[in-house]
Amino acid sequence: SWQLQLNGLQANQLTLHAAQLAVAQDSQSPGAPLAVARANHLIAQNDPKPFLSLVAFSPQRAIVFGAYRLTMRTNDGGKTWADWSLNIADPLSHHLYGEAVVGHDIYAVGEAGLVFRSKDGGDSFPQVAPAGSTTLFGALGTGDGGVLVYGVAGTLYRSSNGGASWVAINMPSSANFTDAITLNSGAILLTGESGVIYISHDHGNSFTALPARLPMAIFAAAQAPDGTVVIAGDRGILPLKF
């Protein structure tokens, strides 16, 4: 069973409270006054913004990312939430679509190729070098200390230095890349809206397409304990054996 812990209208109130507190404390965050104005507008319009991604570090600690830099954090298993948006170093408040935990670091990615890296357990998310200029939908550790980011129109970048610089990986597809997972074997699986699945056996340095193209747009993938890869797309759920 499921129990609602937080909705967008509540998040707007939390955002307003955090922004007002930051302004009152003369916060150095340049986005605090803008956050106050935006939260007041959203509350007046009764307009909640969506959550887009979640990362859980333990049964108690989690961070949720969303539209317009919306970020919420819980340290008690979701009993209470705090707005964490001003801890994302993005005064223009871009959408945040995905995240990855790589070693002790947390990466968050979003619009305009923006990548944020937390080295303090999620307390702060300064920007690192952007990975291109198009929207990024997700990130994944490569298993050797590197990180991949992927997104719109076949965008795929790899960094081996914590996001200080990025190398573009040329792919034969211009479809949006939607998900990436690490298989039990250590290989990396990359999925796209075109129905093509790519696989890497060298920590994400190169990818090859699997022979069969699925007859649907792929939005997410996960590997079951028995090794089956479960694909979710616009036509339902499909199990694949590797």
Provide a role label for each language-model segment.
Residues 1-242:
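Residue-level hotspots at or immediately adjacent to binding/recognition sites across diverse folds
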